[in-house]
């Protein structure tokens, strides 16, 4: 791609005629103007010799050999196959949820047969959301059209013949399997839906799990090539009241003019709370002619580094070293830099009945309390030398190599009270907690 305007084109697939250009249900609107792909080719590209075959049934997931035979015959006489495949309206619409991510089997069967002919196969895929793409290796090119609106056929032709250069990027991750998605363990549920991802939504989940994906968040190709270089920060050390200016250069190293979406992520956040590996904090689109370089600029502030702290009722940026990452997708990071953040606010420390003995030992007022409780509880002491001997002695089968002192330091205050035989009451626990929070 792109193809010449004089190509012999075999357009195959019912979705080339009955185009899914919008959603169903309450989202359905009447278009002001709409043409299918065959009409666009006939009216706007008179030199293109186009044929059409339905190829598969849309209402039923059955292989129709008559449809298939016509499609294969047309494809054999063509220079390029334009195969329109995707989710029929009956498989994906308002009012019900999908139970799988598969495309209809009859469409995949036809793709395999078309690929066996040895002709270039360009797939235009129509879906409202990600689907499994284990069949994608059979296609020479794949355009994820989603439901692209009433002008989708015009856009398809412009992309096919090079009047437009693709520059879109995926706004979601396409997984390799339904079982890889975070909702797969709890969906479907009756009456309730539990969103268990927390802050690990979308690409954040797949990154944290270090899980391979079919196509990552932010992915998208072009007919030209792009080089990222010269990442620079205006400061190496900032406070959470400052802004940070990030710049980098983007060069079109290919042979066609085009647009590139540059993505900026912030990663390696300090681990005071569970955080994603990285998060998108900005993106911009630039146009470059072949050989041209453009400088792109991003401005980051406190929110770019922060998480919402429930106790503070505000966004909080922890002190520490963060990574600034520039890339073409969430899995294609081209440039990296680091910046040191200094928080100007101190998180108010609060304690409850689950405060551990180890935490109490870090407080001057708590050390005497802990020592008194440990003495009263009379935990047996095991020296480090003895503990190591028992851990490594294969003949010692007695399970006594536990470091009781370490176990005691991890014990919550309320559990010490439970195990004290009445020596420490719940009232005593409340008194200690109240004193800690003064």
PLM region spans:
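C-terminal non-catalytic regions of proteins with extracellular/luminal or membrane-system context
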Residues: 1-438
């Amino acid at each position: 791609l792109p193809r010449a305007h004089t190509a012999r084109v075999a357009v195959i697939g019912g979705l080339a005629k009955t185009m899914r250009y919008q959603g169903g249900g309450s989202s359905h609107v009447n278009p002001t103007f709409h043409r299918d792909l065959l009409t666009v080719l006939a009216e706007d590209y008179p030199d293109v010799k186009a044929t059409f075959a339905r190829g598969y049934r849309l209402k039923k997931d059955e292989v129709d050999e008559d449809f298939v035979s016509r499609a294969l015959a047309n494809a054999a006489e063509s220079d390029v196959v334009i195969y329109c495949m995707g989710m029929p309206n009956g498989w994906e619409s308002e009012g019900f949820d999908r139970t799988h991510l598969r495309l209809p089997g009859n469409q995949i069967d036809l793709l395999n047969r078309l690929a066996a002919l040895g002709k270039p196969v360009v797939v235009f895929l129509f879906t409202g959301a990600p689907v499994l793409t284990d069949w994608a290796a059979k296609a020479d090119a794949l355009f994820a059209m989603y439901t692209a609106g009433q002008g989708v056929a015009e856009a398809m032709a412009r992309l096919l013949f090079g009047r437009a250069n693709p520059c879109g990027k995926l706004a979601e991750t396409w997984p390799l399997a339904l079982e890889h998605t975070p909702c797969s363990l709890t969906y479907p549920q009756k009456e309730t839906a539990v969103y268990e991802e927390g802050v690990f939504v979308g690409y954040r989940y797949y990154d944290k799990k270090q899980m391979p994906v079919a196509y990552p968040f932010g992915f998208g190709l072009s007919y030209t090539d792009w080089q990222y270089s010269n990442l620079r920060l205006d400061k190496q050390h900032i406070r959470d009241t400052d802004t940070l200016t990030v710049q980098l250069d983007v060069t079109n190293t290919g042979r066609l003019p085009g647009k590139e979406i540059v993505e900026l992520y912030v990663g390696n956040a300090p681990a005071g709370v569970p955080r994603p590996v990285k998060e998108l904090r900005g993106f911009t689109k630039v146009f470059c002619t072949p050989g041209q370089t453009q400088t792109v600029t991003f401005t980051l502030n406190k929110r770019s580094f922060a998480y919402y702290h429930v106790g503070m009722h505000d966004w909080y940026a922890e002190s520490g070293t963060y990574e600034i990452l520039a890339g073409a997708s969430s899995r294609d990071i081209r440039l990296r830099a680091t910046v040191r953040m200094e928080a100007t606010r101190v998180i108010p420390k609060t304690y409850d009945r689950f405060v551990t003995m180890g935490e109490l030992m870090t407080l001057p007022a708590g050390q005497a309390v802990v020592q008194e409780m440990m003495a009263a509880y009379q935990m047996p002491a095991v020296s480090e030398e003895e503990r190591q001997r028992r851990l490594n002695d294969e003949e010692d089968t007695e399970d006594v190599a536990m470091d009781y002192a370490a176990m005691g330091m991890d014990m919550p205050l309320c559990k010490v009270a439970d195990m004290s035989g009445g020596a420490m009451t719940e009232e005593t626990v409340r008194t200690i907690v109240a004193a800690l929070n003064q």
